Amino acid sequence: MAQTTPTPHVALIFGGNGWIGNKVFNILNANPDVTVYKAKSRADDADSVAKELDCYGNVTHVMSFIGRTHGTYEGEKITTIDYLEKPGKLVENMRDNLFAPLLLASVCKERNIHFTYLGTGCIFDYDDEHKYGDVTTGFTEQDLPNFFGSSYSTVKGYTDRLMHLLNNDTTLNVRIRMPITDEIIDRNFITKITNYKKICSIPNSMTVLNELLPVLMNIALDKKTGTINLTNPGVISHNEILEMYKDIVDPSFTWANFTIEEQNLILASKRSNNCLDTTILEYDSNYKVKNIKESVRDVLTLMKGNIYP
């Protein structure tokens, strides 16, 4: 039996060893008002989850940073959602991107524990009502998914809808997009696009983790519920990021563009492109969040320091 703790918040993180989950663990671990644990039970095993919650006894927050977006198939490392288009990957997709998060949400609802689910905003695509690159017509938290061009987005879209329907009173459903940090790793969106041979440049909402993860933790610890679009205000295109990268990080960097039609020919699945409305994040939550272009510039300055210390 784990010892009780006097801290006001006790958090149990599923996916705490993953890229984003570990970042969240470190943020919470540095907060003297929080005791944080990395879950050892499997998120798709209800009995194990219940036993682990019973073990700690005083958990106030459960957070899910699990999910399936990449993997290795027949010896090939696939760093994109095209992994989920491979034969036999439907089970992993449904288990990790639908069943496990909903199981955690259900268990938390039964115990009146606040649950934070890291979902995605890659469930929308520009259309006649949500115009290409137009920040005034962004998808709101209440909009229903309209993009089903990949197995990943299809499953995650229905997970998003179920979080609305079943668990809105205890669950914080968080939508992020194209996560960005200053790290030189293949999970970082900037690193990804600097390594691509060709780029399809489209204005999109994106999430700068350096800035928004601490904001998310404040929202979660305040036990806010419902859905929130956790992206920096505004949109930025791939070319704009790469132009900044060339200006700030590597003056010798070059790239080539191709069309979305040409991109679709080489990918196993289509990609979501959209602008998410950030009114709730900016105004209802009272957090001062930088515009995406300003925040990306800040991250690139840090990235330069990581490459050329």
Region locations from a protein language model:
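SDR active-site strand-loop-helix element
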Residues: 14, 65-66, 115-121, 174-176
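NAD(P)-dependent short-chain dehydrogenase/reductase
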Residues: 130, 149, 161-214, 218
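Glycine-rich Rossmann NAD(P)(H)-binding loop
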Residues: 198-203, 228-236, 284
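Amphipathic terminal alpha-helices
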Residues: 2-3, 290-309
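NAD(P)H-binding glycine-rich loop region in Rossmannoid oxidoreductase-like domains
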Residues: 44-98
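Mid/C-terminal beta-alpha module of Rossmann-like enzyme folds, strongest
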Residues: 215-268, 272, 298-300, 307-309
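Catalytic helix-loop patch of NAD(P)-dependent Rossmann-fold dehydrogenases
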Residues: 86-95, 99-100, 122-174, 181
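N-terminal Rossmann NAD(P)H-binding glycine-rich loop of SDR-like oxidoreductase domains
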Residues: 4-29
